[in-house]
Amino acid sequence: LKCHKLVPPFWKTCPEGKNLCYKMYMVATPMIPVKRGCIDVCPKNSALVKYMCCNTNKCN
């Protein structure tokens, strides 16, 4: 699986066991990602922070 880093088009190959790409952003500024990368389990959203997770190449 290949996931984008914070600034596309840069990406990295995920290590074994991290089978999701994710994008974390603040609810107040959804167009500005705070973090991107590979993750094993999609974190829960909170009142301030949301996560978008997906399992295809470079989908974050």
Swiss-Prot record:
Signal sequence region: none
Classification via InterPro entries: Cytotoxin_Cobra, Snake_3FTx, Snake_toxin-like_sf, Snake_toxin_con_site, Toxin_cobra-type
Its job: Shows cytolytic activity on many different cells by forming pore in lipid membranes. In vivo, increases heart rate or kills the animal by cardiac arrest. In addition, it binds to heparin with high affinity, interacts with Kv channel-interacting protein 1 (KCNIP1) in a calcium-independent manner, and binds to integrin alpha-V/beta-3 (ITGAV/ITGB3) with moderate affinity.
Protein name: Cytotoxin 5
Keywords: Cardiotoxin, Cytolysis, Disulfide bond, Membrane, Secreted, Target cell membrane, Target membrane, Toxin
Disulfide bonds: C3-C21, C14-C38, C42-C53, C54-C59
Any one Pfam family match given in the protein's UniProt record, by short name: Toxin_cobra-type
Chief location bin: secreted
Family the entry assigns: Belongs to the three-finger toxin family. Short-chain subfamily. Type IA cytotoxin sub-subfamily.
Quaternary structure and partners: Monomer in solution; Homodimer and oligomer in the presence of negatively charged lipids forming a pore with a size ranging between 20 and 30 Angstroms.
Subcellular location: Secreted; Target cell membrane
GO cellular component: extracellular region; membrane; other organism cell membrane
Tissue: Expressed by the venom gland.
